[in-house]
Each structure stands twice: as structure tokens, then as C-alpha cells.
Amino acid sequence: MNYIGAHVSSSGGLEKTVLRAIQIKATAFSFFTKNQRQWFSPPLIQKKIDQFKAMCIKYSFQPQQILPHSSYLINLGHPIDELLRKSRKSFIDEMIRCSQLGLIFLNFHPGSHLNKITENACLLRVSDSINIALEKTQNVIAVIENTAGQGTNIGYCFEHLSEIIKNIDDKSRVGVCIDTCHLFASGYDLRTKKDCENTFEKFNSLIGLKYLKGIHLNDSKKKINSRVDRHESLGLGEIGTAAFTWIIKNENFSNIPIILETANPMIWEEEIDWLRSQKKL
């Protein structure tokens, strides 16, 4: 079955994320385990952990349906050693928070070279950062998100993701989340069924579908290969609806969280209903 949902707010308590997911008829969701604009937050208290777990049980959310997202401040490929250490410490803290909540994924953007080191050096720093985090934590899978290639961000091509994974010691604890807006903005076509087939054949060849742990389903305000990350509601952007229908009907993407981060949260429930209707066609 498809797990479909959206990135919901954790305002008011982590347990509220489950209720917000239910309100839009979601069977998957994403959220920040802490303030995404801060490096560190107070440790989770046991009461909040228990409340979150109880809500997940009450509404039948399993760990594989939930794809928490890390802080945007973290840059696991940072060229400056002091800020690289800070990023690594923050990332490990978020991995621990996920483990405490009984979750198995942490989705993150790989990082940026900031024009201070080469892309290859940055990719190696990301791999080293993940290895350090995996050594210091248990159970949680580090899920690398592809990027649009905006600015000096790495991770905008399958070769980058493959290179990061190649240098991970425990490959059972690394995965990939594909964001369709980022994919399109970085030059991978998705506008027709054939385009989708070609793009994901490349993904399977260079990385492997076994590493795909989640999908961020977003249309794009900007044209293909724009290298600009601007999400749009499904069918209202440059990608169009064919890609989303193809993805939702593809059995390779069953049993992984498919998360909306589209432009208008007010129509998330409508978008989820539409996706489910496409599955039935």
C-alpha cells in the first residue's frame, strides 16, 4: 500500500504531529523533532516521548510511515572544521532524538562546499560525517535527500548520492529520499511517463532502488534544470500531473512514505485524495 502524507508542524508538542496528519487523512507524515532554525534544543523529556508513541499507536502509524527531517543548519560537508564539528554534533543529537521516539529514519540535506573545497572533498566529508553518526547511534537510518543544486549545494545528481553511499561503512543504515521538485530543478525530466521511467532507471542503475526510503512529492515553480528550489502544488507547476500519477501507481514505491511539501497546506487533504484516486485508475 502507499503511505501518503505531508510535512506537518510540531508546534505545541510532537504528539500534535500525529493529529495534524490524521486531519488531512494522511497515512504518512514528516516533521522536525526540534526547532529547525536552531543547532540544539533541550533534550526530549520522557513524558513527551511517551505521548508521541501513544498517539502513533492509537492512530496506527508505524515507524516506516514517518520521515522526520533534520535542521536546515546542518552541513555535513562543511569546509570549515569548527562548523563541521558543530554540524556533526547536531546531527548525532537528531539521530538520538529519532531513536528515542522509536523512529527509524532521519532525512537530511547533504550539505554545501561554499566554494571553499571541491565537490569531491565535500562528498567525502558527508560520508565521514554519516559514518561518525552511525557509530554513535543505533537503529536510525540516515536518509540523504537529493538537492536542486542551488548555490553550492551538493547532492544534485545521482552520482553524488552514489559516491556518498559508496563510502559508508554500514550500508544497511543509509538511504535516499527523492524530492521530485529538486530532481526536476537539477535537470532530470519527469514530465511524461517515459521520462519518469528513464530517470528512475538511472537511479536504480547508479544507486539502487533498495536505498529509496522515501519520496517528497512536489511540483516545481521553476523550469527543468533551473537549479532553483521552489515547490508548487501538484499539477500547477512545470512538472505536471503525469509524474505523480506514475509514482503513485508504481509498486516500487509502495511501503515507503510519500510526503507532500507542496506550496499550499490548505489543499493537502485534497492532494492526498487525488493521489489515492490515481492509484485506482
From Swiss-Prot:
Zn(2+) 2 binds at residues 145, 179, 216, 261. Its cofactor is Zn(2+). Binds 3 Zn(2+) ions. Zn(2+) 1 binds at residues 69, 109, 145. One of its GO terms (biological process) is base-excision repair. It comes from the Bacteria. Its EC number is 3.1.21.2. Zn(2+) 3 binds at residues 182, 229, 231. InterPro entries: AP_endonuc_2, AP_endonuc_F2_Zn_BS, Xyl_isomerase-like_sf, Xyl_isomerase-like_TIM-brl. One of its GO terms (molecular function) is zinc ion binding. SUPFAM superfamilies: Xylose isomerase-like. Belongs to the AP endonuclease 2 family. HAMAP family: Nfo. Endonuclease IV plays a role in DNA repair. It cleaves phosphodiester bonds at apurinic or apyrimidinic (AP) sites, generating a 3'-hydroxyl group and a 5'-terminal sugar phosphate. This is Probable endonuclease 4. It comes from Buchnera aphidicola subsp. Acyrthosiphon pisum (strain APS) (Acyrthosiphon pisum symbiotic bacterium). The gene is nfo.
